[in-house]
């Protein structure tokens, strides 16, 4: 019951950090302001002169003892932060810890004000207050938070941590409060003051830990996470390990029961002391804190503001306070600047801006193994990048690529060793004025929080490695070299590295190291990036034996006006001018009033192959399936495998005693190959139950037909069947497309129809539909191989209008195979491209609407590309545009002016060829300007 309450409370605080922080600070300010403006009626030393005996008692405090107490309090606080440092980034945890201490002190002061007590005795009670602060539980809760990989997991893990830690902390707080409260009955005034402040600070600390700290921790981690994809920079490890560690530290049930008994006994003691013996024992009152003798006090006029009076009392400029401040400054500086090397000598190398830091205790040999990768230009434009100073193959969770630099970097190009590594990164954006060598060796600042965590030493023996892997601390305690040894000895399958290491990025890095040693050129993978990618979406879904990811440029064509709605269409391609040409077609069709589309068919297919003893039996089964009642029975079995699968038809064909069945079904917003395969398998089992002689030879008999040129897809359709049409007025054809409707119609007939027929084409009656289909497929995470059938397209053109100057064109695409859920659509970049067109995931208004809309967009974009390319061919601009804008080298010399251009200058005495040359030239790769 308590765990559930703390779970809900932790989830609320961590999911609403701003609200909790603002409410806590507002409550603190309100409590402080209650008595700050009104003031206490009697404040010793400010508006009243205390009795002589009180002053004497105050002045007789042992300064040496208090100085020792303050020193111990500062040292204890430093040790608490050092413990907290072991869980992760010292800056994140330091900020959270400082927030906690500051807020606890501030809130304690507010509580003291709320109870009507003054703060003049808090300066001596401050060390006691600091000694009561225990950051162990804060460290435990922080470990729960740092084991998260996303911000949503941060909220969940903080809530789980609160559910585990909350009951224990509550019990400890109650018992400690009751124990300290015994001191309030000691009749020793100084002890009563200390215990009073201690009780109030415990209550304040408990409130802050339960509310302010979870909210602050959640907010700090959210603000510090600069990686949109991939693991956050503060990611610590597996949640299960943190949970297991906390379970190991769980208090003994016997101790918990003893605490409960102590709590009950202490409550009875206090009840007896305060309630039953009230006549013999004085209650704790204000007189304990400012003055108990009302008759001997003398009222005086304040000589300073109340806040200044409290400040001088809390921190007077005396020698013991100055020594305490110096000690606190030294320890804080040591914690911030030297704690890495002093506390963890195994972290020999730190990542800094252009400097190399080596542990002084390391010998020359170890230091010589540290590589320094150059720095980028120091210009302000490169301030957002940091340089990885050193990388070795001994990193635990952040291993780099085992590829050596090229000879131009003054490093050996010999085969890879375990101590020569170089990170591979894919960086987008300008790199300032640095040289090319420097540009290749820099990465963004948020990508480098990497330090070495192990000594540079030889791998341990194989038996010890197996014990660590199977029984000990697990793969996290192994270096990359040791993991490679286990892979080479077949103890770890290479394809399971991500799962066994429980760190996908490290698994990919280790696999790259293994593969690099097998390549003829060891640094072949240097330019293939792998870091800062969320492989959790890849494993078991999109790719196996991953060694990186392939960045492909993504352009946008649009706005595409389709059925009254505008779309920006993403296209991933390396073919120059493709996006620009498609963009020009979109502009022309938008000016013409847009494109209209119609979905004429929908259904993914799977065509299994079965064999029967004779053709006669095969024919009988074919006729049996044509009976509606029998088809309904198979349909019911088929649809039992998925709530989205809806079987539409079963088409059969015989080849002797072999029977091919083509199951066609709706698959919702998924492309549906896996879905329909499961349904087909169950349908075949049902058919086999009724006809035992059926022998299922293959779930796919190429009668589908998938990823192969086939007339059946062109005729019967597969996936989505879409037709798009538009009418382009004559003035747009002439002004935008630079041609005429009659020329386009004539070219389309002889090129797309006659030419394709002469080539024996099946579904290829178009100019370049596959270009657009493939570019959109790669951008949106579709199966790129399915462009074979999806690119089936017939482009038709006709003249329209009174004078035949308008152009009517249509594109018919009967087999667009795509989906908006599953497969590569789950990858974050591809998902973003789907989101651009508002077709990401399943449609909440109807199953399959998003996939159908995407198919319409594909067909409409194909039509825009067809119109632009055909216009370029008709006008004779194709070769010229590609020679200018689709070459990797510098542009060839610009051609001489055309006859038409010369004619416009006939009235001039001379022709300015240089001006014409400048107007026709363009920078490399800027075909968008001319095509838009």
UniProtKB/Swiss-Prot annotation:
Residues 357-442 are annotated as: Disordered. Pfam families: HMG-CoA_red (PF00368), Sterol-sensing (PF12349). Its main location: endoplasmic reticulum. This is 3-hydroxy-3-methylglutaryl-coenzyme A reductase. The active site is at residues 575, 707, 783, 882. Pathway: Metabolic intermediate biosynthesis; (R)-mevalonate biosynthesis; (R)-mevalonate from acetyl-CoA: step 3/3. Residues 343-467 are annotated as: Linker. Glycans are attached at residues 279, 850, 886. InterPro entries: HMG_CoA_Rdtase (IPR002202), HMG_CoA_Rdtase_cat_sf (IPR023074), HMG_CoA_Rdtase_CS (IPR023076), HMG_CoA_Rdtase_eu_arc (IPR004554), HMG_CoA_Rdtase_metazoan (IPR004816), HMG_CoA_Rdtase_N (IPR023282), HMG_CoA_Rdtase_NAD(P)-bd_sf (IPR009023), HMG_CoA_Rdtase_sub-bd_dom_sf (IPR009029). Keywords: Cholesterol biosynthesis, Cholesterol metabolism, Endoplasmic reticulum, Glycoprotein, Lipid biosynthesis, Lipid metabolism, Membrane, NADP, Oxidoreductase, Phosphoprotein, Steroid biosynthesis, Steroid metabolism, Sterol biosynthesis, Sterol metabolism, Transmembrane, Transmembrane helix. GO terms for molecular function: hydroxymethylglutaryl-CoA reductase (NADPH) activity; NADP binding. GO terms for cellular component: endoplasmic reticulum membrane; peroxisomal membrane. It is found in: Endoplasmic reticulum membrane. SUPFAM superfamilies: Multidrug efflux transporter AcrB transmembrane domain, NAD-binding domain of HMG-CoA reductase, Substrate-binding domain of HMG-CoA reductase. The gene is HMGCR. Its EC number is 1.1.1.34. Residues 406-421 have a biased composition (Low complexity). Residues 374-403 have a biased composition (Polar residues). One of its GO terms (biological process) is isoprenoid biosynthetic process. The modification Phosphoserine is found at residue 888. It is an enzyme of class 1 (oxidoreductase).
């Amino acid at each position: 019951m308590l765990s559930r309450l703390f779970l809900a409370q932790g989830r609320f605080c961590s999911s609403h950090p701003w609200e909790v922080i603002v409410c806590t600070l507002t409550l603190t300010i309100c409590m402080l302001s209650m008595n700050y403006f009104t003031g206490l009626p009697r404040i010793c030393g400010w508006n009243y002169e205390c009795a002589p005996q009180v002053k004497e008692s105050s002045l007789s405090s042992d300064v040496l003892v208090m100085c020792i107490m303050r020193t111990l309090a500062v040292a204890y606080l430093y040790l608490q932060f050092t413990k907290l440092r072991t869980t992760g980034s010292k800056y994140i945890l330091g900020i959270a810890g400082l927030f906690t201490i500051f807020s606890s002190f501030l809130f304690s002061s507010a509580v003291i004000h709320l109870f009507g007590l003054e703060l003049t005795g808090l300066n001596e009670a401050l060390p006691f207050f600091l000694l009561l602060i225990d950051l162990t539980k804060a460290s435990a809760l922080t470990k729960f938070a740092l084991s998260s990989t996303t911000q949503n997991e941060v909220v969940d893990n903080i809530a789980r941590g609160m559910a585990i830690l909350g009951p224990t902390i509550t019990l400890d707080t109650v018992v400690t409060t009751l124990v300290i409260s015994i001191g309030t009955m000691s009749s020793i005034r100084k002890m009563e003051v200390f215990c009073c402040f201690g009780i109030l600070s415990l209550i304040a600390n408990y409130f802050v830990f339960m509310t302010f700290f979870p909210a602050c921790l959640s907010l700090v981690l959210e603000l510090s996470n600069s990686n949109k994809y991939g693991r956050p920079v503060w990611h610590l490890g597996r949640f299960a390990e943190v949970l297991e560690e906390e379970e190991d530290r769980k208090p003994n049930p016997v101790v918990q029961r003893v605490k409960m008994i102590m709590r009950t006994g202490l409550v009875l003691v206090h009840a007896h002391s305060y309630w039953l013996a009230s006549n013999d024992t004085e209650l704790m009152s204000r007189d304990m804190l400012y003055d108990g003798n009302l008759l001997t006090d003398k009222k005086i006029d304040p000589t300073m503001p109340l806040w200044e009076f409290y400040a001088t009392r809390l921190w007077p400029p005396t020698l013991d306070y100055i020594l305490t401040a110096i000690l606190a400054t030294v320890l804080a500086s040591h914690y911030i600047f030297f704690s890495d090397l002093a506390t963890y000598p195994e972290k020999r190398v730190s990542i800094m801006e252009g400097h190399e830091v080596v542990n002084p205790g390391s010998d020359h040999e170890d230091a010589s193994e540290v590589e320094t990768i150059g720095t980028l230009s120091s210009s302000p434009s490169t301030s957002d990048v940091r340089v990885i100073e050193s990388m070795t193959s001994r990193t635990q969770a952040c291993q780099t690529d085992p590829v050596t630099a090229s000879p131009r970097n003054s490093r050996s190009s010999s085969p890879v060793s375990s101590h020569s590594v170089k990170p591979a990164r894919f960086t987008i954006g300008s790199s300032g004025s640095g040289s090319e060598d420097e540009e290749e060796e820099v990465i963004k600042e948020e990508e480098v929080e990497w330090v070495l965590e192990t000594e540079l030493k030889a791998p341990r023996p194989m038996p010890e490695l197996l014990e660590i892997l199977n029984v000990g601390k697990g793969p996290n305690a192994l270096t990359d070299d040791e993991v490679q040894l286990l892979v080479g000895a077949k103890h770890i399958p290479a394809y399971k590295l991500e799962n066994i290491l429980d760190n996908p990025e490290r698994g990919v890095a280790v696999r790259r190291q293994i593969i690099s040693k097998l390549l003829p050129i060891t640094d072949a993978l240097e330019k293939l990036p792998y870091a800062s990618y969320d492989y959790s979406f890849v494993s078991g879904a999109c790719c196996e034996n991953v060694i990186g990811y392939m960045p492909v440029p993504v352009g946008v064509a649009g706005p595409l006006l389709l059925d009254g709605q505008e779309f920006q269409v993403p296209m991933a391609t390396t073919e120059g001018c493709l996006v620009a040409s498609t963009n020009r077609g979109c502009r022309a069709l938008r000016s013409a009033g847009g494109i209209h589309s119609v979905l004429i068919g929908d259904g993914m297919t799977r065509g299994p192959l079965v064999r029967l003893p004779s053709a006669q039996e095969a024919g009988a089964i074919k006729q049996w399936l044509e009976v509606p009642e029998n088809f309904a029975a198979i349909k019911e079995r088929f649809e039992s495998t998925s709530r989205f699968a809806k079987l539409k038809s079963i088409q059969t064909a015989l080849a002797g005693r072999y029977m091919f069945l083509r199951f066609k079904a709706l698959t919702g917003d998924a492309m549906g190959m896996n879905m329909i395969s499961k349904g087909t398998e169950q349908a075949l089992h049902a058919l086999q139950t009724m006809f035992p002689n059926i022998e299922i030879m293959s779930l796919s008999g190429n009668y589908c037909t998938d990823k192969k040129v086939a007339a059946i897809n062109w005729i019967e359709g597969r996936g989505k069947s879409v037709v798009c049409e538009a009418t382009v007025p004559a003035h747009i054809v002439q002004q935008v497309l630079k041609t005429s409707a009659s020329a386009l119609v004539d070219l389309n007939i002889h090129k797309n129809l006659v030419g394709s027929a002469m080539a024996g084409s099946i579904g290829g009656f178009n100019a370049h539909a596959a270009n657009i289909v493939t570019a959109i497929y790669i951008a949106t995470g579709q199966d790129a191989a399915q462009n074979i059938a999806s690119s089936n397209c017939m482009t038709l053109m006709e003249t329209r209008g009174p004078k035949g100057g308008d152009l009517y064109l249509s594109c018919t695409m009967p087999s667009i195979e795509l989906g908006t859920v599953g497969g590569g659509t789950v990858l974050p970049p591809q998902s973003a491209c789907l989101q651009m067109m508002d077709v990401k995931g399943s449609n909440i208004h109807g199953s399959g609407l998003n996939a159908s809309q995407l198919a319409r967009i594909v067909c409409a974009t194909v039509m825009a590309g067809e119109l632009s390319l055909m216009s370029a061919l008709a006008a004779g601009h194709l070769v010229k545009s590609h020679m200018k804008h689709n070459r990797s080298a510098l542009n060839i010399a610009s051609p001489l002016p055309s006859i038409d251009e010369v004619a416009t200058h006939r009235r001039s005495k001379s022709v300015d060829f240089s001006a014409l040359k400048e107007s026709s030239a363009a920078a490399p790769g800027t075909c968008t300007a001319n095509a838009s």
